[in-house]
From Swiss-Prot:
Top-level taxonomic group: Eukaryota
Domain F-box: 9-55
This protein's GO CC annotations: secretory vesicle
UniProt-listed InterPro entries: At5g39450-like, F-box-like_dom_sf, F-box_dom
Organism expressing this protein natively: Arabidopsis thaliana (Mouse-ear cress)
Protein name as catalogued: Putative F-box protein At5g39460
């Protein structure tokens, strides 16, 4: 008599492939993989391209036309689904850092078989900036999908010689990640391909900040790869066939760089092999074993270390960095013995936890508090923090990202205005009886109030009786609410405020007006992904690699706009 498992498998096998693909919409990727346990005869059904295309659609991060476009460069829709679920979906969104004060906004979006982190630069914009897509941005990092769905990481950066890419590993990406960390990762010799085995040792985050900074500087300097066009070209595909071919060529170049390092131009990429990252590590441990107690004798052993031929300047850089990490620290005279010993112990433990060291990107979920929609973050980590985004309720009609400028009416000013990006979120009053709308500033062109300040706080349940104080410019206002707008004060916890009103126009514009003044912010909802895909904006060269990921110093100037554009840097 046929057992239940075999009977169930036979029923599934009798279904047409198209019918099973429809049924699979109600299953998760893990459910489909588990069907193999019902019988080996189901393998062909489970591996069906139609079934996994449906699963890719159900992830809901790419439209169907782009899924088909991505399939060209990957072995199967099953491999593509793996990348979408493990990498793309958890990372998409807006990531921020508290420094510099003008704002540090990194928008993570799909590229071409990749995920790209783009920094929106503090800037002044033309009156019709949103229609024309005139936004300055800069690349921060990319995660590339291999032919089998595996993943590789590139940090973007530059130095005096031009633009560089810094390859590395992608560590664990948690599904509900809210912190993105740039780290140096120990690697064991027995690790193969893109797998890393951690030995017992203190994690990178336990090291002193200066040690972490110097390790990152050493490793990025070692693994850096000079790049020119087309590697610094467009990161986002269009529907043009020519563009598609260029994107595929660029992605193949990146895969070769991950696999072969500096020799990538002279070696063919085998598509049937898994990505193996053997040329993006630095053997710090072997170096240190040869150093002994005399750090100053590094010149005698430089030739024993396999490093990229980057002249003696890099050797001097490496030597000074190692001296700082393991040398005779003058800071021990200042620090207490217990603090100094703890620091040295953590350092030694970390450096003994692997045979080689590489650059890594890690996305983890940590317990993180927030203040009026702004995450409370540490300033001494090389990290980006995801803006907490609750799924808006049906009546949370204004929640989301809005952009705009000071002034009214929009689009009529002759001079460029400072771009403001505000994240609008809902909350409750302290009494819990009224709904509050917070307009949290995440980007501006001036630092009068720090990043994370609430530009306005509006009581959604209380209509405003104030008339709109300007010419309506032919627009009708459907709603208005009472609130307060930021004024004099200091910090984002203790700002001053003045009463004001939020006006909602019939064409989806918001205008917050400070009562008794002519100050007004005009906002419209924006889609950064669509703006960047238009390729009409200006791509600004990145900063030095570690600063490009996280700018750890407080600054009131526009540090991101000091670089020239790619076109000028490649001349």
């Amino acid at each position: 008599m046929m057992n239940k498992e075999s009977f169930g498998a036979c029923l599934l096998l009798t279904l047409p492939e198209d019918v099973f693909a429809v049924i699979s919409r109600f299953l998760s990727p893990s459910d489909i993989c588990n069907l193999i346990l019902c019988g080996k005869s189901l393998c062909a059904l489970v591996d069906s391209e139609k079934t996994w295309l449906v699963q890719c659609e159900e992830v809901k991060v790419l439209p169907l036309i782009e899924l088909v476009q991505w399939r060209i460069g990957i072995s199967s829709y099953k491999a593509l689904c793996r990348f979408l679920v493990e990498v793309v979906k958890p990372l998409l969104g807006i990531w921020v850092q508290e420094n510099p004060e003008l704002g540090n906004v990194v928008y993570v979006m799909p590229g071409f078989l990749s995920v790209v982190g783009c920094r929106i630069i503090p800037q002044k914009v033309a009156p019709l900036w949103i229609q024309e897509g005139q936004v300055k941005w800069s690349p921060v990092f990319e995660i590339i999908c291999g032919f089998d769905g595996s993943k590789g990481f590139f940090l973007h950066g530059r130095d005096k010689q031009g633009s560089f890419l810094y390859p590395g590993f992608v560590m664990d990406i948690e599904k509900s990640c809210n912190v993105l960390l740039l780290e140096v990762e120990p690697r064991s010799e027995k690790s193969s391909c893109n797998e890393i085995e951690r030995e017992v040792g203190d994690p990178f985050g336990d090291l002193d900040f200066s040690d972490r900074m110097n390790l990152l500087d050493i490793v990025t300097k070692h693994v850096s790869l000079r790049v020119d066009e087309p590697l610094t070209g467009n990161l986002f595909p269009t529907r043009s066939k020519y563009d598609e071919a260029m994107m595929l060529e660029r992605r193949n170049m990146l895969l070769k760089m991950l696999k072969f390092g500096g020799n990538w131009k002279h070696i063919n990429l085998e598509e049937d092999e898994q990505l193996c990252y053997n040329h993006i590590e630095i053997d710090i441990k072997k170096l240190l074993e040869n150093l002994g107690d005399d750090i100053d004798n590094m010149e005698d052993i430089e030739d024993q270390i396999e490093v990229t031929p980057r002249k003696k300047s890099f050797r001097r850089f490496l030597r000074s960095g190692i001296k700082h990490i393991l040398g005779k620290f003058s800071s021990s005279k200042i620090n207490s013995p217990s603090s100094s010993e703890t620091r040295r112990s953590n350092r030694q433990s970390f450096l003994s936890s692997g045979n080689t060291f590489c650059l890594s990107l890690k996305a983890s979920c940590t317990l993180m508090s927030s203040y009026e929609g702004w995450p409370i973050m540490s300033a001494d980590n090389f990290s980006l923090h995801k803006l907490p985004m609750k799924k808006p309720l049906d009546h949370d009609v204004y929640a989301g990202l809005w952009g705009g400028t000071f002034g009214w009416p929009p689009g009529k000013d002759i001079e460029d205005e400072s771009l403001l990006l505000l994240m609008l979120t809902y909350g409750e009053s302290e009494e819990g009886s009224e709904r509050i709308l917070f307009g949290t500033k995440i980007l501006s062109y001036f630092a009068e109030h720090p990043n994370g300040s609430s530009m306005f706080v509006v009581n959604i349940d209380t209509p405003s009786l104030e008339p709109f104080p300007f010419d309506t410019d032919g627009r009708d206002f459907e709603h208005s609410y009472t609130g307060e707008g930021i004024a004099d004060g200091y910090g984002f916890r203790y700002p001053g405020s003045k009463p004001g009103s939020l006006f909602v126009s019939s064409n989806d514009l918001l205008a917050f007006v400070w009562q008794g003044t002519e100050d007004v912010i005009t906002l419209q909802r924006i889609n950064l992904g669509e703006i960047l895909k238009k390729s009409l904006g200006s791509c600004v060269s990145p900063l030095l690699p570690t600063k490009n990921f996280t700018y750890t110093k407080r600054s009131y100037s526009n540090v991101f706009a000091k670089s020239s554009t790619y076109s000028s840097s490649s001349e």
